[in-house]
Amino acid sequence: MRKRYDTIVIGGGIIGTSIAYHLAKAGKKTAVFESGEVGKKATSAAAGMLGAHAECDKPGTFFEFARASQKAYKRLTGELKDISGIDIRRHDGGILKLAFSESDREHLMQMGALDSVEWLEADEVYKLEPNAGKGILGANFIRDDVHVEPAAVCRAFARGARMLGADVFEYTPVLSIESEAGAVRVTSASGTAEAEHAVIASGVWSGALFKQIGLDKRFYPVKGECLSVWNDGISLTRTLYHDHCYIVPRHSGRLVVGATMKPGDWNEQPELGGIEELIRKAKSMLPGIESMKIDQCWAGLRPETGDGNPYIGRHPENDRILFAAGHFRNGILLAPATGEMMADMILGNPVKTEWIEAFKAERKEAVHR
């Protein structure tokens, strides 16, 4: 007999496990099919910045969605610990977006429309982070842009979903999705299962399944390289950010530095040139990092869409098939809101119309960010 579920989620990264968790919490019989290990692809490669403001300079639909997701982490920190027993290691302190030039300053001043952003002059920056690099003209201080440990969040979502009754199948790649009377049939390497709904949440690898279900949307890999070092005692409380590079302090005593952006590269191994670029940028923000011992280097593939924004919604011609993929640099940040939105759509709960319109697959223009 085929296994039958309310919903099958295809993909066990932070997006897929968030969807499964929110559905299981609502009492839905849910399964996750993951081709490898849960959270071992793009999720494990991320630094975990909840940088709603780092990714958006102005208010708009994307920013509102990102802020809603960012705020959800406050609730989830305790909730996931209670249900799963896992601490997602949410770290307060915020982000300092640094200005080293007048053009940097002018760009950062454009964020003044956001009431959650505070401009600091150079002396105020050095009071907060006395070990920051020389030549800083000022910074935007964003208290709400905290960070979490992505692998811990994904494990917490997955274990939480299991505790609430979901099945999570690892090393179970999905081969096909087909609609039949009253159900969706999902065939994997381990057999066939049926569900009322199926959600494609496989990151950059979602393209093949999109093609199967008749959606002419592509996902483009953007390789991101990172490294971590062991902090030998230099004080750093807040994340430092400049020129698309960040230094994130971890509870473990490590500092995470990331991330490069290499479009079209499917290779998941870090390269010397990319790591060299990160070290150069990190030294300008925190000179003392030069003497720190390297812990490890790694890379992951971000899933980029044609306009840089995710596809979150229903198949335009089949209400039983949904998707949540293409989160690019923002998978960790957007995981809670994406999970809630998918669950609400499946449960028939209200969802903001502007979110549906902004992230539907058949949209014609990019979301204003």
Swiss-Prot record:
Biotechnology: This glyphosate-degrading enzyme could be of potential use in agricultural biotechnology for the development of new-generation herbicide-resistant plants. The SCF-4 mutant obtained by engineering shows significant improved catalytic efficiency towards glyphosate, and a better affinity to glyphosate than that reported for glyphosate oxidoreductase GOX in a Monsanto's patent.
Binding, substrate: R302, R329
GO CC terms, sorted: cytoplasm
GO biological processes: thiamine biosynthetic process; thiamine diphosphate biosynthetic process
Effect of K81R: Shows 7.1- and 8-fold increase of affinity and catalytic efficiency to glyphosate, respectively, while the substrate affinity to glycine decreases 235-fold and catalytic efficiency decreases 113-fold
Catalytic activity, as annotated: glycine + O2 + H2O = glyoxylate + H2O2 + NH4(+); glyphosate + O2 + H2O = aminomethylphosphonate + glyoxylate + H2O2 + H(+); N-ethylglycine + O2 + H2O = ethylamine + glyoxylate + H2O2; sarcosine + O2 + H2O = methylamine + glyoxylate + H2O2
InterPro entries with a match to the protein in the record: FAD-dep_OxRdtase, FAD/NAD-bd_sf, Gly_oxidase_ThiO
Effect listed in the UniProt record for changing S202C: Shows 7.1- and 8-fold increase of affinity and catalytic efficiency to glyphosate, respectively, while the substrate affinity to glycine decreases 235-fold and catalytic efficiency decreases 113-fold
One annotated GO molecular function: flavin adenine dinucleotide binding
SUPFAM superfamilies named among the record's database cross-references: FAD-linked reductases, C-terminal domain, FAD/NAD(P)-binding domain
Similarity comment text for this entry: Belongs to the DAO family. ThiO subfamily.
Protein's job: Catalyzes the FAD-dependent oxidative deamination of glycine, leading to glyoxylate, ammonia and hydrogen peroxide. Is also able to act on various amines and D-amino acids to yield the corresponding alpha-keto acids, ammonia/amine, and hydrogen peroxide. Can also oxidize the herbicide glyphosate (N-phosphonomethylglycine), and thus may be involved in the degradation pathway that allows B.licheniformis J33-8 to grow with glyphosate as the sole source of carbon.
Name under which the protein is recorded: Glycine oxidase
The organism of origin for this protein: Bacillus licheniformis
Taxonomic placement: Bacteria, Bacillati, Bacillota, Bacilli, Bacillales
